[in-house]
Amino acid sequence: MRTLEDSSGTVLHRLIQEQLRYGNLTETRTLLAIQQQALRGGAGAGGTGSPQAPMEIMAPEDSQVLQQATRQEPQGQEHQGTETHLAENGLYRLCPQPGKGEELPTYEEAKAHSQYYASQQAGPWPHVGDRDPRGPPGGSRRQDEALRELRHGHVRSLSERLLQLSLERNGARTPSHMSASHSFPQLARNQQGPPARGAPTAEGPEPRGPPPQYPHVMLAHETTSAVTDPRYRARGSPHFQHAEVRILQAQVPPVFLPQQQQQYQYLQQPQERHPPPHLAALSPPGVEGPASTQASLATSGSTHLAQMETVLRENARLQRDNERLQRELESTAEKAGRIEKLESEIQRLSEAHESLTRASSKREALEKTMRNKMDSEMRRLQDFNRDLRERLESANRRLASKTQEAQAGSQDMVAKLLAQSYEQQQEQEKLEREMALLRGAIEDQRRRAELLEQALSNAQGRAARAEEELRKKQAYVEKVERLQQALGQLQAACEKREQLELRLRTRLEQELKALRAQQRQAGTPGGGGGSGGTPELSALRLSEQLREKEEQVLALEADMTKWEQKYLEERAMRQFAMDAAATAAAQRDTTLIRHSPQPSPSSSFNEGLLTGGHRHQEMESRLKVLHAQILEKDAVIKVLQQRSRKDPGKVTPGSLRPAKSVPSIFVAAAAGTQGWQGHSSSERQVDASAQLAADRAPLEEPVAVAPLAAHAKHGSRDGSTQTDGPPDSLEPDSLLGCSSGQRTASLDSIATSRVQDFSDMVEILI
């Protein structure tokens, strides 16, 4: 176990050192966290490990980088901290950082780029003619960009960068190959189509870029400037330089530097000779170079091709090394993952072992305490058992002595009990003879009590019947008095209403006479002054219409009073029927209660003798109940017959009620006296009828007191103001005109509809 932990610790130390030198900041922090977790686990299990041991093994420069890596940057400045850490390294000073938004291709895309570039090697070299007139500063800037890309090139190889640079400069020549590829969308994205041949632009000849600059090339003056720069002297030793940079500097051939200078000189020379066919298409028309320029271009192109072959071979070798290193890195990462899983499992097992040991120690302590408690309990129970045995022996001894004494005393007690039982038997025989004599006397008394109870029940029945008759007579007297009072009130109200109607009729007749006289006076000068009589005619017409409307209002009010009176009568009859039914039910209940068997003090003696009398009383009570039901039904039948007699005499909705309603009240009173025979009185009905009769008088007074205009009345049947026929016309049709006739018809229809609605409402209430 200890050996495995040591081996995993050494592997982690090596990984951390390599990551501090060649890796990025996030992976370094991850490995440091893993190491600290492993050290904590080892220190918790064994207690011998020290977290400061791996820090002592590291190199000074690694510990310095570790201190910078473990420092926590402020929030929102993560990128700034990373760039500060990278700027302190000498290699990153030589390699400027790329833009943050630069998109890096994957390994598969780089491999496809290299294959595509190898297929394009056989064609003519297109970079000679595409020179940028800007000169060497553009090439140095591209070299700086290539070195900046080398900082992020842990996964990308040199062939990827070469292919990207060559495609950026030669993308205009082969657009069809790029756009036709569906497998590499990044190639098709970065390409732009060339301009049409023979179509000159207003800006003159199109500037082209310099030949491809490879990231492994570093010019002499740039190298010297980077070394002589005072910013780089502090950390310019080979110890701080990256291994790949040292290899690339060693692999730069000495011949390549003057050739680069020659290429920069070619950018400043005019093109005197004709370029090759594939370059002539890209150059503008009318531009030609001298023969010396063509020869130098050919020689430089051949040397450049030879250098490209060497670079490609080196690129293939580096690619193989990269793949091998990548496989080793994957295997190492897999081993590290396994080691981490093993460490976590070991830590989990150690924690489980500790928990088991703690649980076992607790269990042992608990078992020990329970054993001690059980031993003490057993000792206590043994002592208690010993005491119980002693007490049982003493109790057995006392019980044996007591049984002997009890046997001696029981024999004496048996002799005494036998003597007492003989005496009690003699007394029992004597009591039986006395009981037989008493039973005979009790039977005689029971017969006398039955006779007395029969006489008492007969007397009570006669008294109850007399009381019932007395109550009925009193109720009849009270009803008659209340009906007489109600009748007097109704008669007074009717007389008052007749007087009011008579006064109203006389007043209306006087107004009618006055109106006819006015009409005659207005009709005599009608031929001479037609223009002056028009407002008088309109005033007469309006006054006549006002009278008609007031007459209709009076007729409707009279109908309303008639229907109110009829509703009160019907309500009184219905209330009388309900009171009759309630009275019959109450009488039936009182009869049952009074004739029910009542317990008496001597009922325990004569229960067997009074069964026949009780049956007879029950039969009588049932007969009385049936008689009360028959009376109730007779009352309902009489009410229905009276209502059926009143139905044929109903007045039509358009006609008015008769003036005198006294005979109808007498008929209702006579029917009530016939139906109330044998029933109890209803105080609520009499009070309601008296109250409604008293309320009708103030309702009729405003009708007569209100100021009314003159009305034209018709011939009445019984001397009252109400009539059945239609009203006579007060003026001719020539005076009324068409508009007044239409208004009168509409008013009549409205009044008729109101009367019908009111009659329907009354019928619903009934």
Curated annotation (Swiss-Prot):
Glycyl lysine isopeptide (Lys-Gly) (interchain with G-Cter in ubiquitin) cross-link position in this chain? 341, 402
Question: Location of site Required for interaction with YAP1 and ubiquitination at K-341 and K-402?
Answer: 214
User: Which is a Gene Ontology cellular component entry for this protein?
Assistant: cell junction
Positions occupied by motif PDZ-binding: 763-766
User: Is Ubl conjugation set as a keyword in this record?
Assistant: yes
Region spans: Required for interaction with CDH5: 101-301
**UniProt region (Required for interaction with CDH1), positions on chain:** 221-301
| Compartment list | Recycling endosome; Cytoplasm; Cell projection, Podosome; Cell junction
Coiled-coil residue windows: 303-575
| Primary localisation category | other
Where is region (Disordered) located? Answer: 64-103, 121-144, 171-213, 262-302, 516-537, 676-743
Q: Which residues carry this modification: Phosphotyrosine?
A: 107
A Gene Ontology MF term for this entry? actin filament binding
Q: What are the Polar residues biased-composition ranges?
A: 64-79, 176-193, 291-302
Site positions per UniProt: Required for interaction with MAGI1 and ACTB: 107
- Tell me where in this chain the PTM Phosphoserine is found: 746, 749
BP terms from Gene Ontology: actin cytoskeleton organization; angiogenesis; endothelial cell morphogenesis; establishment of cell polarity involved in ameboidal cell migration; hippo signaling; negative regulation of transcription by RNA polymerase II; positive regulation of protein localization; regulation of cell migration
Indicate, by first and last residue, each region the UniProt record lists as having compositional bias (Gly residues): 524-533
Q: Which UniProt keywords apply?
A: Cell junction, Cell projection, Coiled coil, Cytoplasm, Endosome, Isopeptide bond, Phosphoprotein, Ubl conjugation, Wnt signaling pathway
Q: How is it modified after translation?
A: Monoubiquitinated at Lys-341 and Lys-402 by Crumbs complex-bound WWP1. De-ubiquitinated at Lys-341 and Lys-402 by USP9X; the interaction may be promoted by cell contact inhibition. Deubiquitination of AMOTL2 negatively regulates Hippo signaling activation.
**General function of this protein:** Regulates the translocation of phosphorylated SRC to peripheral cell-matrix adhesion sites. Required for proper architecture of actin filaments. Plays a role in coupling actin fibers to cell junctions in endothelial cells and is therefore required for correct endothelial cell morphology via facilitating transcellular transmission of mechanical force resulting in endothelial cell elongation. Required for the anchoring of radial actin fibers to CDH1 junction complexes at the cell membrane which facilitates organization of radial actin fiber structure and cellular response to contractile forces.
Task: Describe the family membership recorded for this protein in Swiss-Prot or TrEMBL.
Answer: Belongs to the angiomotin family.
Summarize subunit and interaction data from the UniProt record for this chain.
Part of a complex composed of AMOTL2, MAGI1 and CDH5, within the complex AMOTL2 acts as a scaffold protein for the interaction of MAGI1 with CDH5. The complex is required for coupling actin fibers to cell junctions in endothelial cells. Within the complex AMOTL2 (via its N-terminus) interacts with CDH5. Interacts (via N-terminus) with MAGI1. Interacts (via N-terminus) with ACTB; the interaction facilitates binding of cell junction complexes to actin fibers in endothelial cells. Interacts with CDH1; the interaction may facilitate binding of radial actin fibers to cell junction complexes.
Q: What is this protein called?
A: Angiomotin-like protein 2
The record's gene field reads AMOTL2
